[in-house]
Amino acid sequence: MQLNTLSMVHEFLRRTVKPGDFCIDATAGKGRDTALLCRLTGDAGRVLAFDIQEAAMAQTKALLAAEGLTAEVIRDSHANMERYAAAETVDCVVFNFGRLPGGDPSIFTRSDTSVAALEAALRLLKPGGVIAIALYYGGANGYGERDAVMTWLETLDDRKFSVLR
Protein backbone atom coordinates (compact mmCIF):
# COMPACT_ATOMS: atom_id res chain seq x y z
CA MET A 1 0.00 0.00 0.00
CA GLN A 2 1.28 3.44 -0.93
CA LEU A 3 1.43 5.64 2.16
CA ASN A 4 0.03 9.08 1.53
CA THR A 5 -2.54 11.22 3.28
CA LEU A 6 -5.49 9.79 1.36
CA SER A 7 -4.50 6.15 1.92
CA MET A 8 -3.95 6.73 5.65
CA VAL A 9 -7.32 8.45 6.06
CA HIS A 10 -9.06 5.69 4.09
CA GLU A 11 -7.43 2.98 6.22
CA PHE A 12 -8.59 4.81 9.37
CA LEU A 13 -12.13 5.01 7.95
CA ARG A 14 -12.13 1.30 7.03
CA ARG A 15 -11.31 0.46 10.64
CA THR A 16 -13.84 2.92 12.10
CA VAL A 17 -16.98 3.19 9.95
CA LYS A 18 -19.52 0.37 10.15
CA PRO A 19 -22.60 -0.68 8.17
CA GLY A 20 -25.56 1.49 9.18
CA ASP A 21 -23.45 4.47 10.27
CA PHE A 22 -24.36 8.08 9.47
CA CYS A 23 -21.36 9.86 7.95
CA ILE A 24 -20.60 13.27 6.49
CA ASP A 25 -18.01 14.09 3.85
CA ALA A 26 -17.67 17.79 4.64
CA THR A 27 -15.55 18.51 1.55
CA ALA A 28 -16.69 16.18 -1.23
CA GLY A 29 -14.14 17.23 -3.84
CA LYS A 30 -13.75 14.42 -6.38
CA GLY A 31 -15.94 12.10 -4.31
CA ARG A 32 -13.38 9.50 -3.24
CA ASP A 33 -14.12 9.84 0.48
CA THR A 34 -17.86 9.99 -0.23
CA ALA A 35 -17.70 6.75 -2.24
CA LEU A 36 -15.70 4.98 0.46
CA LEU A 37 -18.13 6.11 3.15
CA CYS A 38 -21.04 4.81 1.05
CA ARG A 39 -19.36 1.42 0.62
CA LEU A 40 -18.57 1.20 4.34
CA THR A 41 -22.00 2.28 5.61
CA GLY A 42 -23.87 0.11 3.12
CA ASP A 43 -27.55 0.28 2.27
CA ALA A 44 -28.50 0.75 5.92
CA GLY A 45 -26.24 3.79 6.32
CA ARG A 46 -26.55 7.43 5.36
CA VAL A 47 -23.92 9.68 3.79
CA LEU A 48 -24.08 13.45 3.25
CA ALA A 49 -21.48 15.11 1.00
CA PHE A 50 -20.93 18.88 0.93
CA ASP A 51 -19.13 21.09 -1.55
CA ILE A 52 -19.56 24.62 -2.84
CA GLN A 53 -18.20 23.93 -6.33
CA GLU A 54 -20.45 22.65 -9.08
CA ALA A 55 -17.48 20.84 -10.65
CA ALA A 56 -16.83 18.95 -7.41
CA MET A 57 -20.48 17.99 -7.08
CA ALA A 58 -20.56 16.73 -10.67
CA GLN A 59 -17.42 14.63 -10.13
CA THR A 60 -18.80 13.19 -6.89
CA LYS A 61 -22.17 12.35 -8.45
CA ALA A 62 -20.48 10.74 -11.48
CA LEU A 63 -18.25 8.56 -9.28
CA LEU A 64 -21.19 7.48 -7.12
CA ALA A 65 -23.29 6.66 -10.20
CA ALA A 66 -20.44 4.67 -11.77
CA GLU A 67 -20.12 2.59 -8.60
CA GLY A 68 -23.87 2.25 -7.99
CA LEU A 69 -23.66 4.15 -4.71
CA THR A 70 -26.05 6.64 -3.14
CA ALA A 71 -25.33 9.74 -1.05
CA GLU A 72 -27.01 13.08 -0.50
CA VAL A 73 -24.75 15.50 -2.40
CA ILE A 74 -25.40 19.03 -1.15
CA ARG A 75 -24.15 22.29 -2.65
CA ASP A 76 -23.53 24.25 0.52
CA SER A 77 -20.69 25.21 2.80
CA HIS A 78 -19.52 22.59 5.25
CA ALA A 79 -20.05 25.28 7.90
CA ASN A 80 -23.81 24.79 7.37
CA MET A 81 -23.90 21.03 7.97
CA GLU A 82 -26.08 21.48 11.06
CA ARG A 83 -28.95 22.44 8.75
CA TYR A 84 -28.94 18.86 7.44
CA ALA A 85 -28.32 16.70 10.52
CA ALA A 86 -29.38 16.72 14.16
CA ALA A 87 -27.04 17.03 17.13
CA GLU A 88 -25.34 13.84 18.30
CA THR A 89 -26.55 11.72 15.36
CA VAL A 90 -23.41 11.45 13.23
CA ASP A 91 -20.81 8.70 13.55
CA CYS A 92 -18.05 10.16 11.36
CA VAL A 93 -17.17 13.45 9.64
CA VAL A 94 -14.36 13.67 7.07
CA PHE A 95 -12.60 16.90 6.05
CA ASN A 96 -10.01 17.56 3.33
CA PHE A 97 -8.93 21.16 3.72
CA GLY A 98 -7.27 22.92 0.80
CA ARG A 99 -8.48 23.04 -2.78
CA LEU A 100 -9.98 20.72 -5.38
CA PRO A 101 -7.11 19.09 -7.31
CA GLY A 102 -7.40 20.22 -10.90
CA GLY A 103 -10.14 22.67 -9.97
CA ASP A 104 -10.27 26.44 -9.89
CA PRO A 105 -7.11 27.43 -7.95
CA SER A 106 -8.82 30.57 -6.66
CA ILE A 107 -11.37 28.48 -4.72
CA PHE A 108 -10.15 26.82 -1.55
CA THR A 109 -11.29 26.20 1.99
CA ARG A 110 -10.82 29.09 4.40
CA SER A 111 -9.90 29.09 8.05
CA ASP A 112 -13.05 30.92 9.20
CA THR A 113 -15.52 28.50 7.60
CA SER A 114 -13.32 25.49 8.28
CA VAL A 115 -13.12 26.14 12.02
CA ALA A 116 -16.88 26.85 12.08
CA ALA A 117 -17.45 23.53 10.30
CA LEU A 118 -15.25 21.67 12.79
CA GLU A 119 -17.22 23.16 15.67
CA ALA A 120 -20.48 22.13 13.96
CA ALA A 121 -19.10 18.63 13.41
CA LEU A 122 -18.37 18.27 17.12
CA ARG A 123 -21.98 19.14 17.94
CA LEU A 124 -23.26 16.62 15.39
CA LEU A 125 -21.07 13.74 16.56
CA LYS A 126 -22.49 10.92 18.63
CA PRO A 127 -20.50 10.05 21.73
CA GLY A 128 -17.63 7.91 20.43
CA GLY A 129 -17.87 9.45 16.95
CA VAL A 130 -14.81 10.46 14.96
CA ILE A 131 -13.59 13.33 12.80
CA ALA A 132 -10.86 12.75 10.20
CA ILE A 133 -8.99 15.82 8.98
CA ALA A 134 -6.54 16.05 6.08
CA LEU A 135 -4.82 19.43 5.72
CA TYR A 136 -3.30 20.44 2.39
CA TYR A 137 -1.62 23.81 2.74
CA GLY A 138 0.64 26.27 0.99
CA GLY A 139 0.01 27.71 -2.45
CA ALA A 140 -2.61 30.44 -2.77
CA ASN A 141 -4.15 29.46 0.57
CA GLY A 142 -0.85 29.74 2.43
CA TYR A 143 -0.57 28.45 5.98
CA GLY A 144 -3.32 30.41 7.72
CA GLU A 145 -5.90 27.66 7.55
CA ARG A 146 -3.43 25.02 8.74
CA ASP A 147 -2.45 27.21 11.68
CA ALA A 148 -6.09 27.97 12.56
CA VAL A 149 -7.10 24.29 12.47
CA MET A 150 -4.07 23.21 14.51
CA THR A 151 -4.76 25.95 17.07
CA TRP A 152 -8.41 24.86 17.25
CA LEU A 153 -7.37 21.24 17.82
CA GLU A 154 -5.19 22.36 20.73
CA THR A 155 -8.25 23.89 22.43
CA LEU A 156 -10.11 20.57 22.61
CA ASP A 157 -10.55 19.10 26.08
CA ASP A 158 -8.22 16.10 26.13
CA ARG A 159 -10.47 14.42 28.70
CA LYS A 160 -13.19 14.24 26.03
CA PHE A 161 -11.27 14.12 22.74
CA SER A 162 -8.23 12.29 21.40
CA VAL A 163 -6.23 14.02 18.67
CA LEU A 164 -3.81 12.04 16.51
CA ARG A 165 -1.47 14.16 14.37
Outline where the language-model segments fall.
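Class I S-adenosyl-L-methionine
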Residues: 139-165
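Helix-to-beta-strand junctions that scaffold the AdoMet/dcAdoMet cofactor pocket
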Residues: 18, 41-42, 125-127
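Conserved SAM-binding motif I beta-strand of class I
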Residues: 46-51
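Mobile active-site "lid"/loop adjacent to the S-adenosyl-L-methionine
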Residues: 95-117
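S-adenosyl-L-methionine
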Residues: 1-22, 26, 35, 39, 57-91
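Conserved beta-strand signature within the Rossmann-like core of class I S-adenosyl-L-methionine
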Residues: 27, 117, 124-135
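Conserved glycine-rich SAM-binding loop
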Residues: 29-31
